């Protein structure tokens, strides 16, 4: 469910309130100020949709998702992912910003822990961009420009959205 127009703390409080009643609802993606995705069991999300609106959300809308990502419902998948990553990763890393901590990591052990946690913890997207903006000249998104739109609300740094090989080649000419 995407919730628009509420502060992070209000969304978190509603999730805690739901959890205290045995419901499985979790803040899952902190996209930008006033936009949080909430994950959980669909019946639980549906039950609390109206409460988000009552507490001031401009919009609370169920998303067509096949899995409740970035929340404790994926605990078993997280453990399985850890086992697969153990043999897939090596020790050589360029710094990568973790969506779990919004900070860089550079080692295999950090990668293993943080990538497993990424399945069961919220995505700190806006915090990741805010924390990294001073060390980059621009951001590059490969895809449909969803993140470029969010970045406009988070940082003054430009974000380039690349959705084709031709766009990638053109971008590389410009940045050389």
Task: Describe every region a protein language model picked out.
Residues 89-176:
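Acyltransferase/transacylase module recognition
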Residues 1-118:
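Alpha/beta catalytic cores of group-transfer enzymes, especially the acyltransferase/condensing modules
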């Amino acid at each position: 469910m995407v919730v628009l127009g509420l502060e992070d703390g209000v969304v978190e409080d509603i999730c805690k309130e739901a959890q205290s009643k045995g419901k499985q609802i979790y803040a899952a993606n902190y996209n930008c100020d006033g936009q949080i995705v909430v994950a959980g069991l669909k019946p639980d999300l549906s039950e609390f949709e109206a409460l988000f609106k009552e507490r001031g959300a401009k919009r609370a809308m169920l998303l067509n998702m096949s899995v409740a990502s970035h929340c404790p419902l994926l605990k078993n998948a997280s453990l399985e992912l850890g086992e697969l990553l153990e043999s897939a990763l090596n020790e050589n890393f360029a710094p990568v910003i973790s969506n779990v901590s919004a900070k860089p990591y550079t080692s295999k052990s950090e990668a293993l822990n943080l990538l497993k946690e990424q399945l069961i913890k919220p995505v700190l997207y806006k915090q990741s961009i805010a924390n990294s903006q001073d060390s980059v000249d621009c951001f590059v998104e490969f895809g449909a420009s969803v993140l470029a739109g969010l970045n406009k609300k988070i940082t003054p740094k430009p974000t380039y959205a690349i959705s084709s090989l031709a766009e990638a080649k053109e971008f590389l000419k410009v940045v050389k």
